[in-house]
């Protein structure tokens, strides 16, 4: 049985960094941007067609990205986000079947709901997230707050649309953890300890 950890996160909480820290400590590959590359490669499209997959729900042109005519899309050059979600879901399932993996976002907890995964949601207080964005991205506090709220809204809309669930709601996860309490490394250690105690990290 493979160890699969799905990590959802509030924007600015450092959830992506936490996932990377968990992966480094356990020697497990982390799929975030790498997932986009793999999805694009396996479906015959440029990586850029998957960028922002969690950030939108719309119909858009594929003509500048179309490369192989695979998946039966023909020469129309158009495909909607529902098709892209299906492709992405297949890629995520393939990753989970092939070996241990940590998957960041992308509704992976829902896509892999029939497997014995560890589903984690990383959150943090607004003030902490704003501070991180100011320090790491060079934004002023107002810009950081506006960006944070916008990203969280779009992630929530994307997740709720495809899963019929509630993004960030505790019942959807095995563990919800505030990264501001222990920091990135301490949060990663806590997730690993919890996962081992729960029998989900093997």
Q: Predicted segment positions?
A:
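Extreme N-terminal starter segment of soluble prokaryotic enzymes
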Residues: 2-4
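ATP-dependent small-molecule kinase phosphotransfer cores
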Residues: 40-100
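Small-molecule kinase domains that catalyze NTP-dependent phosphoryl transfer to phosphate-bearing small molecules
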Residues: 60-65, 140-185
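Long, contiguous binding/interaction regions
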Residues: 106, 110, 126-127, 139-140, ...
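Conserved phosphate-donor/acceptor-positioning beta-strand/loop module used by diverse small-molecule
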Residues: 114-151
């Amino acid at each position: 049985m493979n160890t699969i950890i799905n990590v959802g996160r509030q924007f600015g909480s450092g959830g992506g960094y936490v996932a990377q820290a968990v992966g480094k400590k356990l020697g497990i590959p982390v799929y975030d941007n790498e997932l986009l590359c793999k999805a694009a490669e396996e479906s015959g499209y440029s990586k850029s067609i998957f960028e922002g997959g969690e950030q939108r729900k719309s119909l858009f042109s594929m003509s500048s990205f179309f490369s192989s005519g695979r998946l039966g899309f023909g020469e129309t050059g158009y495909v909607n986000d529902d098709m892209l979600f299906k492709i992405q879901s297949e890629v995520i399932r393939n990753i989970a079947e092939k070996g241990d993996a940590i998957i960041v976002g992308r509704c992976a907890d829902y896509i892999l709901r029939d497997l014995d995964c560890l589903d984690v949601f990383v959150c943090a207080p607004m003030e902490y997230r704003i501070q991180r964005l100011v320090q790491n991205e060079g934004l002023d506090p107002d810009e950081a707050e506006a960006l944070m709220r916008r990203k969280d809204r779009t992630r929530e809309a994307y997740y709720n649309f495809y899963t019929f669930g509630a993004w960030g709601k505790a019942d959807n996860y095995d563990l919800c953890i505030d990264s501001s309490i222990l920091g990135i490394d301490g949060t990663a250690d806590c997730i690993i300890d919890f996962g081992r105690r729960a029998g989900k990290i093997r």
